[in-house]
Amino acid sequence: MTDRVIIFDTTLRDGEQALKASLTVKEKLQIALALERLGVDVMEVGFPVSSQGDFESVQTIARHIKNARVTALSRAVDKDIDAAYEALKVAEAFRIHTFIASSALHVEAKLKRSFDDVVGMAVAAVKRARNYTDDVEFSCEDAGRTGIDNICRIVEAAINAGATTVNIPDTVGFCLPNEYGNIIAQVRNRVPNIDKAVISVHCHNDLGMATANSLTAVQNGARQIECTINGIGERAGNTSLEEVVMAMKVRQDFMGVDTRINTQEIHRVSQMVSQLCNMPIQPNKAIVGSNAFAHSSGIHQDGMLKNKNTYEIMSPETIGLKKEKLNLTARSGRAAVKGHMADMGYNEQDYDLDKLYDAFLKLADKKGQVFDYDLEALAFIDMQQGDEDRLVLDKLSAHSTKEYPATAFVQLKLDGNKLITSSIGGNGPVDAVYNAILNLTGLEIKMSHYNLTAKGEGAEALGQVDIVVEHKGRKFHGVGLATDIVESSALALVHAINAIYRAHKVADIKNHKHH
C-alpha cells in the first residue's frame, strides 16, 4: 500500500505574516474554505495569543471547517497554549502546535537558557497541550542549525510527553537537500520512541531549496510536509504546496507516496490567494505560473501538436486549468456567467452572483470580450463599490499634457445621496485624482505602497491597482480594477478610505459601549 504524506498548510499563519496588510476575517475564511475543498489534512490558521483579531479569525475558521484539522501556533508558554485551545475548541477536529527554539544560537541569544531548561519547557508545553487534545505537534525551531544529538534528545522528550507529530524545521532555509535528508534519517533511526509520532518538515526557501528539502525528507521517512499556497511566507517564502504535491504525484514511481489533495483545485486556490493577498505569481513559477504550460518555441509547439507528451510532463487539466472560452460578451446572461464560474469549480457560495453579474456587464460593455480570468478577478476582489460603502466614485476625468500640469475633476457620492466635487492639479493624472479625493474627504493619509498589475492581455486588459495607505498609525489596503489605470487607481483609494470609515465606525461603537 502506498504511504500517504500529510499536507499541513500554513498559508494563513506563516504565509500571512509576510503580507503588507493583514487579511480580513472574511478573506481568511474564504481561503480556509478553499483549502478545505483542496483537501489539505491540517490547516494552521493563526497565532491566537498575538492579537484579539487573530484569536477571533482562528475561532471563526475553526467553527466553519468540517473536513480538515484546524491548528494554531503557540510558544512553549502556558498563556499561548491556553489561548490556542480557547480559539480552537469549537472546531470539529483540532491540533495544538507548540514550538521552542533548539539551536545554540537561539537558545543562548534569544532564550538565554541552558539546553536542559529548553527541553524542560518543551515537555511542560506538550503536557499542557495534551490536557486539551490528543493531537499535539511539537516543533524545535531552527532545527537546521541544531546539533543532531540535541535534536534527537528534545524530540524523544517531546514524544514521551505526548507529542503525536514532531516537526523538524529548517527555519532560515540554511540546509541543502542531502544534509536535511540526513537529519531526518538520523531522527528516524536514533529516536527510540519515534514510531509513536509522525515526522514533519517545515522548510524555508532562502536558498531556493524548500521543495527539494521537503521531498528529500519524505524519502528519508518524513510523513508530513508544512507548506503554503504559491510558497508565500517570510523572506523568500515557504515550501510551495503545489510544487511538493505535484512532484509526488507526477513522480509517484520514484517517491512511492501520495496525498489526499484534489489537484484540480490547485489553480483556483492559487489565484484566490494571489489576489486576496496581493502577491502576484511570477510567470515562470512552477505549476501555477502563467507560463508553466506555455510553449512558445516553434520546435516545442510542433512537438506539442504532434504529441503533447513530448514537452509536457503533466496536463494543465490536472491542476484545474482549463482553456479559456472566448464566448462571454455583454449579451451573455446570468446563467452563462454562473456556468463559467462553475466550469472553473466555484460554488455559488464562493461569490455574490448579483454583484458579479453587474460588474461583468459593465466590463463587457467596455471590453467586448470577457475571459475566465476577468471573471475570477471580478468575483474575488470584493471591493467594487458595495451597498455599505460611505463613499462611491460617481464621476471622474483627468487631463494631462506636456505643456500643462495634470488636473482632475472628481465627483463622489457620500452616504448614498450627497454629491461632493473637487477639481485640482497634481504631479500626473493619478496624483491629481488622489489630491482631489483627499481634498474631499479631509483625511490625513500617507501612501506606503502602490502596485499596478495587468490582468489579461492586450490593450484592453484590466489594470488592477493595489495600494496600502497609512492613517493614524494603521495600515489600510485598497484594490481597484478597471480598464483605465486612473479609474482603477481612484477605485483603490476609495476602497481604502471606505475601510478607514468602517474602522472609525467600529471605534465609535466600542467607545459608546465604554461610556
From Swiss-Prot:
<dbReference type="GO" id="GO:0005829">
    <property type="term" value="C:cytosol"/>
</dbReference>
<dbReference type="Pfam" id="PF22617">
    <property type="entry name" value="HCS_D2"/>
</dbReference>
<keyword id="KW-0808">Transferase</keyword>
<keyword id="KW-0479">Metal-binding</keyword>
<dbReference type="GO" id="GO:0030145">
    <property type="term" value="F:manganese ion binding"/>
</dbReference>
<dbReference type="GO" id="GO:0003852">
    <property type="term" value="F:2-isopropylmalate synthase activity"/>
</dbReference>
<dbReference type="InterPro" id="IPR054691">
    <property type="entry name" value="LeuA/HCS_post-cat"/>
</dbReference>
<comment type="function">
    <text>Catalyzes the condensation of the acetyl group of acetyl-CoA with 3-methyl-2-oxobutanoate (2-ketoisovalerate) to form 3-carboxy-3-hydroxy-4-methylpentanoate (2-isopropylmalate).</text>
</comment>
<keyword id="KW-0963">Cytoplasm</keyword>
<dbReference type="Pfam" id="PF00682">
    <property type="entry name" value="HMGL-like"/>
</dbReference>
<feature type="binding site">
    <location>
        <position position="202"/>
    </location>
    <ligand>
        <name>Mn(2+)</name>
    </ligand>
</feature>
<dbReference type="InterPro" id="IPR013709">
    <property type="entry name" value="2-isopropylmalate_synth_dimer"/>
</dbReference>
<dbReference type="Pfam" id="PF08502">
    <property type="entry name" value="LeuA_dimer"/>
</dbReference>
<comment type="similarity">
    <text>Belongs to the alpha-IPM synthase/homocitrate synthase family. LeuA type 1 subfamily.</text>
</comment>
<dbReference type="InterPro" id="IPR002034">
    <property type="entry name" value="AIPM/Hcit_synth_CS"/>
</dbReference>
<dbReference type="InterPro" id="IPR005671">
    <property type="entry name" value="LeuA_bact_synth"/>
</dbReference>
<keyword id="KW-0432">Leucine biosynthesis</keyword>
<feature type="binding site">
    <location>
        <position position="238"/>
    </location>
    <ligand>
        <name>Mn(2+)</name>
    </ligand>
</feature>
<feature type="domain" description="Pyruvate carboxyltransferase">
    <location>
        <begin position="5"/>
        <end position="267"/>
    </location>
</feature>
<feature type="region of interest" description="Regulatory domain">
    <location>
        <begin position="392"/>
        <end position="515"/>
    </location>
</feature>
<dbReference type="InterPro" id="IPR036230">
    <property type="entry name" value="LeuA_allosteric_dom_sf"/>
</dbReference>
<feature type="binding site">
    <location>
        <position position="204"/>
    </location>
    <ligand>
        <name>Mn(2+)</name>
    </ligand>
</feature>
<dbReference type="GO" id="GO:0009098">
    <property type="term" value="P:L-leucine biosynthetic process"/>
</dbReference>
<keyword id="KW-0464">Manganese</keyword>
<dbReference type="GO" id="GO:0003985">
    <property type="term" value="F:acetyl-CoA C-acetyltransferase activity"/>
</dbReference>
<dbReference type="InterPro" id="IPR000891">
    <property type="entry name" value="PYR_CT"/>
</dbReference>
<comment type="pathway">
    <text>Amino-acid biosynthesis; L-leucine biosynthesis; L-leucine from 3-methyl-2-oxobutanoate: step 1/4.</text>
</comment>
<comment type="subunit">
    <text>Homodimer.</text>
</comment>
<protein>
    <recommendedName>
        <fullName>2-isopropylmalate synthase</fullName>
        <ecNumber>2.3.3.13</ecNumber>
    </recommendedName>
</protein>
<feature type="binding site">
    <location>
        <position position="14"/>
    </location>
    <ligand>
        <name>Mn(2+)</name>
    </ligand>
</feature>
<dbReference type="InterPro" id="IPR050073">
    <property type="entry name" value="2-IPM_HCS-like"/>
</dbReference>
<dbReference type="InterPro" id="IPR013785">
    <property type="entry name" value="Aldolase_TIM"/>
</dbReference>
<keyword id="KW-0028">Amino-acid biosynthesis</keyword>
<keyword id="KW-0100">Branched-chain amino acid biosynthesis</keyword>
